[in-house]
Every structure is written in C-alpha cells, then in structure tokens.
C-alpha cells in the first residue's frame, strides 16, 4: 500500500550512548500527529537497544543490511529471521555503498529483496545512477536494470515493498537532484513497474535519497511521485531529522 515514509539510515555511526540519546530525542520531538511512517535504521548491533528505547509507537526500527539465507556458515552475517526477532519492519537492499564497497551485484540484491519479503518484512530497494552514467545519458537504462532485476519471481514482486531512488552522485556530497529531476525518475520507475503490474505500480511507495535535508525536503516531497525520503547524514541530528519529517505533512 502506498504510504508516506521518512527513514533515517544511520550507516556506521554512533556508539551506545549516542544511539540511545538520538532515538530518545527524535521520539520526544515527534510530539505531533505525523502523516508519515517514521523509521530509523541503526547499525545492526544497536537494533535491540533502539527497539527497546521506543515508547510511543510513532517510530519503527529497520535494518541496513541482510544476508539472503535463513541460517548457516556465513560468518558475520545476519538473516531476515534474526532481524524479525527484533521487530525490524524495513530492510535496505541494494544501497549504493553496498554495491560499491562490497561488490553486490543485481542477482545478490534480488536474493536479499525476496528473502526479506519471504519473511514478512518490507524491503527498501535502493536504485540510482553514478554521475558518469547520468552525464552519458544512461540514467534510465541503469535504473531499469536495477529495478527489473528483482522481477523474475513474477508480476506480484513489487507488492508490499519500497523503492528508494538515490542518485549516487548526490549521496553524502551535499548535492541533490532537483525536485523535477527526482520526480522524472520516480515517474519512470512507477511507469516501469506498471508494465509488470499496473495495480502494484499505483500503490508502490517511492522515496528519494541523496542529501535530503530540512531545506530541500518540502520541495522534494511536494512532487506527485515522491512519497518520502531516505535520509542519511541529516538523520544523525534529531532536530534536523524531525524537521524533515514535518515536511511530509
């Protein structure tokens, strides 16, 4: 079901005191009726602590990564059943940093995507082009390849999931796509999914990630196919993050 979402990806930041203070501050500041589902995605070791700190029901917890097997000899990895034990609702798959630094290809991302869905959680499929791909006119080609990679399991594969458009050139750089640039790609993704399943395309939640902050969020979220944001650096500041959440109202 299409809904408004603002998710904070904390990446590899914070230790236990900082994480505890951050989630408590965010929850305290969200003392208003929020139009969006708010999620925080801490480093995996702190997921239980963050979950236990939540009191109001206005914030849910998510995970930044998952391994696509239920159990086994995969040293250092976490499975979807493990994440589900700690009430994770959302799981990122295909984030550009995983693709870049850990060489995760389309097939592996697709395995993660379906592993998360098979265990009743919501995968957040991250897609996006590099600066060179954009400059060479390959944006739509790259996005289509990344989106369609998960579609092999049938026409219902985009039901109950989120797609996050995160142009790689805008992540952590301070640069951001204009609202019009982001809208164009979000509409392209919705149309692409519509070729597989029109009903699921209409109900698909599409969010934007790429240097989202309190200054650009309102304009981005006003676009017809942008349903929220995947927030990086700004989510590490409680006040800034909540200001972004307010922009969805």
UniProtKB/Swiss-Prot annotation:
<protein>
    <recommendedName>
        <fullName>Triosephosphate isomerase</fullName>
        <ecNumber>5.3.1.1</ecNumber>
    </recommendedName>
</protein>
<dbReference type="GO" id="GO:0005829">
    <property type="term" value="C:cytosol"/>
</dbReference>
<dbReference type="InterPro" id="IPR020861">
    <property type="entry name" value="Triosephosphate_isomerase_AS"/>
</dbReference>
<dbReference type="InterPro" id="IPR035990">
    <property type="entry name" value="TIM_sf"/>
</dbReference>
<dbReference type="GO" id="GO:0019563">
    <property type="term" value="P:glycerol catabolic process"/>
</dbReference>
<comment type="pathway">
    <text>Carbohydrate degradation; glycolysis; D-glyceraldehyde 3-phosphate from glycerone phosphate: step 1/1.</text>
</comment>
<dbReference type="GO" id="GO:0004807">
    <property type="term" value="F:triose-phosphate isomerase activity"/>
</dbReference>
<keyword id="KW-0963">Cytoplasm</keyword>
<feature type="binding site">
    <location>
        <position position="172"/>
    </location>
    <ligand>
        <name>substrate</name>
    </ligand>
</feature>
<feature type="binding site">
    <location>
        <position position="211"/>
    </location>
    <ligand>
        <name>substrate</name>
    </ligand>
</feature>
<feature type="binding site">
    <location>
        <begin position="9"/>
        <end position="11"/>
    </location>
    <ligand>
        <name>substrate</name>
    </ligand>
</feature>
<dbReference type="InterPro" id="IPR000652">
    <property type="entry name" value="Triosephosphate_isomerase"/>
</dbReference>
<dbReference type="Pfam" id="PF00121">
    <property type="entry name" value="TIM"/>
</dbReference>
<dbReference type="GO" id="GO:0006096">
    <property type="term" value="P:glycolytic process"/>
</dbReference>
<dbReference type="InterPro" id="IPR013785">
    <property type="entry name" value="Aldolase_TIM"/>
</dbReference>
<feature type="active site" description="Proton acceptor">
    <location>
        <position position="166"/>
    </location>
</feature>
<comment type="pathway">
    <text>Carbohydrate biosynthesis; gluconeogenesis.</text>
</comment>
<keyword id="KW-0312">Gluconeogenesis</keyword>
<comment type="subunit">
    <text>Homodimer.</text>
</comment>
<comment type="function">
    <text>Involved in the gluconeogenesis. Catalyzes stereospecifically the conversion of dihydroxyacetone phosphate (DHAP) to D-glyceraldehyde-3-phosphate (G3P).</text>
</comment>
<dbReference type="GO" id="GO:0006094">
    <property type="term" value="P:gluconeogenesis"/>
</dbReference>
<keyword id="KW-0324">Glycolysis</keyword>
<dbReference type="GO" id="GO:0046166">
    <property type="term" value="P:glyceraldehyde-3-phosphate biosynthetic process"/>
</dbReference>
<feature type="active site" description="Electrophile">
    <location>
        <position position="95"/>
    </location>
</feature>
<keyword id="KW-0413">Isomerase</keyword>
<dbReference type="InterPro" id="IPR022896">
    <property type="entry name" value="TrioseP_Isoase_bac/euk"/>
</dbReference>
<comment type="similarity">
    <text>Belongs to the triosephosphate isomerase family.</text>
</comment>
<feature type="binding site">
    <location>
        <begin position="232"/>
        <end position="233"/>
    </location>
    <ligand>
        <name>substrate</name>
    </ligand>
</feature>
């Amino acid at each position: 079901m299409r809904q408004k979402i603002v998710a904070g990806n904390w990446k590899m930041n914070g230790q236990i005191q900082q994480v505890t203070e951050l989630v408590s501050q965010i929850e305290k500041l969200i003392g208003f009726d929020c139009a969006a589902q708010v999620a925080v995605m801490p480093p995996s070791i702190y997921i239980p602590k963050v979950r236990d700190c939540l009191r109001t029901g206005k914030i849910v917890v998510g995970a930044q990564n998952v391994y696509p097997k239920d159990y086994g000899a995969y040293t250092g990895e976490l499975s979807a059943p493990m994440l589900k034990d700690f009430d994770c609702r959302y799981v990122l798959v295909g984030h550009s940093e995983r693709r870049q630094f850990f060489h995760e290809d389309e097939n592996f991302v697709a395995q993660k995507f379906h592993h998360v869905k098979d265990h009743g959680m919501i995968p957040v499929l991250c897609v996006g082009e590099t600066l060179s791909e954009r400059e060479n006119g390959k944006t739509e080609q790259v996005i289509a390849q990344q989106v369609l990679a998960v579609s092999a399991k049938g026409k219902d594969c985009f039901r109950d999931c989120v797609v996050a458009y995160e142009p790689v050139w805008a992540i952590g750089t301070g640069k951001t796509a204009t609202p019009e640039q982001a809208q164009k790609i979000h509409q392209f993704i919705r149309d692409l999914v519509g070729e597989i399943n029109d009903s699921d395309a209409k109900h698909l939640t599409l969010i934007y990630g790429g240097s989202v902050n309190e200054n650009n969020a309102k304009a981005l979220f006003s676009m017809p196919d942008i349903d929220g944001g995947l927030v990086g650096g700004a989510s590490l500041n409680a006040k800034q993050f909540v200001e972004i959440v307010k922009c969805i109202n």
